[in-house]
C-alpha cells in the first residue's frame, strides 16, 4: 500500500470518468482525498492537497531545517535539500545538471538515510527557464523512474518556495511532462494513455 501515487491516481480517475460517464472523480488514498477532473479525453487534472513542511509529518528523524538539509553520500556533498510531504515524503535538490548524478548509485543511499525514518523519494532538479524544470528521480521502493507524479508536485512546490519559479511550472521527465500549479493546494495536470483491458486468472 502506498500513501499517494500521482500517475496511478490519474489513470484510476480516467477509468472512473469513462465508466461512469462523468467529468470528475474522487480518489481516497491512505492519507488523502484527491479530486480529479477530466480536462480532455487524454488529460486529467488532480487536486493533490496541501504540502506538509512539518518535520514530524514529512517525516524526518529529528527537528532540523527541512529547507536546508545537507547530506554526505560517500564522497559526495549534497547541500540545501528541501524535504516535504506531498502525500508521501520527498527531498528535492536543485543542481546545475540533474542528469550528471548517478541515481542508481546514490539514490538508494539517500532513500535509506537515517534522516528519513520512512525512507524518501529523491529528486535532482534543474531550472531550464522560469516555467520549465528538468528532473531526475529516484522513487522510494521502486528505483530510478522515468516519471513520478508526486515528485513533480514536490519539485513545483520547492521551486516556488525557493523563488526559482512562479506557481505554474512544467516538470519535464525523461519521458513526458506534468504541469504543476501551486496556490497552497497543489494541482497536477497530465496525460493519460488509451486503456487496454486485460484478464488475469488468479
Language model features with spans:
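Active-site-adjacent alpha-helix immediately C-terminal to a catalytic or transition-state-stabilizing loop
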Residues: 152-156
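Active-site proximal loop and beta-alpha junction motif in alpha/beta enzyme cores
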Residues: 1-4, 9-145, 157-202
